[in-house]
Amino acid sequence: MLSVRVAAAVARALPRRAGLVSKNALGSSFVGARNLHASNTRLQKTGTAEMSSILEERILGADTSVDLEETGRVLSIGDGIARVHGLRNVQAEEMVEFSSGLKGMSLNLEPDNVGVVVFGNDKLIKEGDVVKRTGAIVDVPVGEELLGRVVDALGNAIDGKGPIGSKTRRRVGLKAPGIIPRISVREPMQTGIKAVDSLVPIGRGQRELIIGDRQTGKTSIAIDTIINQKRFNDGTDEKKKLYCIYVAIGQKRSTVAQLVKRLTDADAMKYTIVVSATASDAAPLQYLAPYSGCSMGEYFRDNGKHALIIYDDLSKQAVAYRQMSLLLRRPPGREAYPGDVFYLHSRLLERAAKMNDSFGGGSLTALPVIETQAGDVSAYIPTNVISITDGQIFLETELFYKGIRPAINVGLSVSRVGSAAQTRAMKQVAGTMKLELAQYREVAAFAQFGSDLDAATQQLLSRGVRLTELLKQGQYSPMAIEEQVAVIYAGVRGYLDKLEPSKITKFENAFLSHVISQHQSLLGNIRSDGKISEQSDAKLKEIVTNFLAGFEP
């Protein structure tokens, strides 16, 4: 083969019309042909080696993984509920994704189909669309990056301030802490509202229900509580700080916007997260929002911090859950609610807890709100939530329209565990006040029928009227605990018994201004000691007496 190629090369090198070829010319042609063949051989060897290395690299770097997805198809869609065929291995409460990009959650796992609730507008889904599993249970972003933001039930920002920067996510349906990690409530959660902090005190880790008819001031108590935490969050002591989560369920968008503006004006948004599932959102989002907010609060609790979560209100969550359950063909029970509506709220509220020091010592306090119809607390949802929580603040329409605001019914309101967390100073001044007010309400009902009352009854009525006036408080004006103690001291010790009831509010404003400007050291002692010492008691008595002597109503 080699000789043939050499001969061909020599022939090409010879002149075409050569008569006689010299030996030198023939020799040089042969040498040139041999050199050409050697260079070609070297090129072939180099190309083969390079090709082999490229192929080897590609084989070693090839992605051998196979991307498998379990999919199903929509059988029917309507009223926010999709019936999906396939998805045989889907989990309960797993997130699924429709071909339109919408997300949903599998709730009903039936033999031949899966009932999926849609998180959004079901008009974007049609029969026959592909649905794929995500393999993930519904989760939301958590962390301090959410503070100051307004998010929807899935944790997506809806305040126009860009995406959430949180890298931590947490499942929305986590189990509540067990018995061992918990410890009894022992630290006060101050609302800044005199009537609450003195009569129905709340502790960190407690669940205190706010219940009443519409337009009786339920949300106002919650918002005042958030605003009052500014005095603690402005400090540097992490143990005193209280991060707040407000969950708006089924409210008007304008109402949520006003609330966010109010918190922003009070400089309270910097430590608050607002989770909004408004009336125009799908029922599944209204159902999910409280659990999403709770997961955000649990992040603080489990990291040794303190958080407060307000569910406003759980009546609307129960209605959304009833709607979903009936559309999923689950059997209805009392008031058409499904049989597990108690579990709906208990598994949510049990996640509020005070953790012991081995588990970080954090806490999550819950203030659920329930709206009653015509003051009926014996309805299904109110009785359920009353039995789950550690007490309730009961607001009455009648008191509200009488001008007693906050319109708290002292007789029906109770805090089952909060007294252990109440500051000693407040216990010293307000210990007898609840009994006095309850007796006053009872006697006042009979006093209108008779005029000849004995001196003790007249004294009880006189004191009750003045204490009721003293507990009135304007909206968005929470008070520090030491200021509350100073004002209530004047009332329960009888210094205001001679003052006209109509002058009580004026006295309170003037007295507080005087104490704050002239006796800051006394307030500081009460705040730091947590109690009224003998010296502080004597000083308070002197201040009240001297102020009343010069007070001109």
From Swiss-Prot:
Residue positions where Omega-N-methylarginine is found in the record: R204
Site (Required for activity): S413
Keyword Metal-binding: yes
Localisation: Mitochondrion inner membrane; Cell membrane
MF GO annotations: ADP binding; angiostatin binding; ATP binding; ATP hydrolysis activity; MHC class I protein binding; protease binding; proton-transporting ATP synthase activity, rotational mechanism
Classification via NCBIfam families: atpA (TIGR00962), PRK13343.1 (NF009884)
Protein name: ATP synthase F(1) complex subunit alpha, mitochondrial
Organism name: Mus musculus (Mouse)
Higher taxonomy: Eukaryota, Metazoa, Chordata, Craniata, Vertebrata
